[in-house]
């Protein structure tokens, strides 16, 4: 979805700290309670089978911007999971408020219904030139906005397939399963001639891609 929750990030909130070619990783959980966020999520996903991980991601996207910036990463997943537990009838808002002793603010209601995958096309092959579909989606999507309408080259097609996130993220259990593709883009094609030379590889679901017009395969 467009806006603050775009998968590619959002301007105005500072740089994302990272270390190049490092085997040193930050501690995953900094406080004792943080691991409970994923534990609670997988109770709903695996034990109760009430929703999917993609629905949790979409519930995080449904957080009000002010609520999002005022909470930590794992807090957002607790709020998202609690939202889905209420929406699927496992608990009620009143029960949640009573247990906590105060009103617990959930994510905003979903206003989009999702969309099905594009099916019936032959898969893309390594070396194919592809173009990312230039689409603006109101609901859940796993495509960063900065690659919309951009051309790239397929480097790899995954052997595994997963439910199309734009559908399963809205509870559509019939979502088509698709591979994802590692697509290489020129940095200058994404951000203009003033950008550094180089390439960016983005993992994209099949339904986000089309064959580039008049394109010939690039030898891998």
Swiss-Prot record:
Extent of the signal sequence: none
The molecular function terms of the Gene Ontology recorded here are: nitrile hydratase activity; transition metal ion binding
Q: List its uses.
A: Industrial production of acrylamide is now being developed using some of these enzymes.
Q: Which InterPro entries match?
A: CN_hydtase_beta-like_N (IPR049054), CN_hydtase_beta_C (IPR042262), CN_hydtase_beta_dom_C (IPR024690), Elect_transpt_acc-like_dom_sf (IPR008990), Nitrile_hydratase_bsu (IPR003168)
Keyword Lyase belongs to the record: yes
The chemistry this enzyme catalyses reads:
an aliphatic primary amide = an aliphatic nitrile + H2O
E.C. numbers: 4.2.1.84
Asked whether the UniProt record includes Lyase among its keywords, one would answer yes
**Annotated family:** Belongs to the nitrile hydratase subunit beta family.
Q: What assembly does the database describe for this protein?
A: Heterodimer of an alpha and a beta chain.
**Physiological role:** NHase catalyzes the hydration of various nitrile compounds to the corresponding amides.
Name recorded for this polypeptide: Nitrile hydratase subunit beta
- What gene does this protein come from? nthB
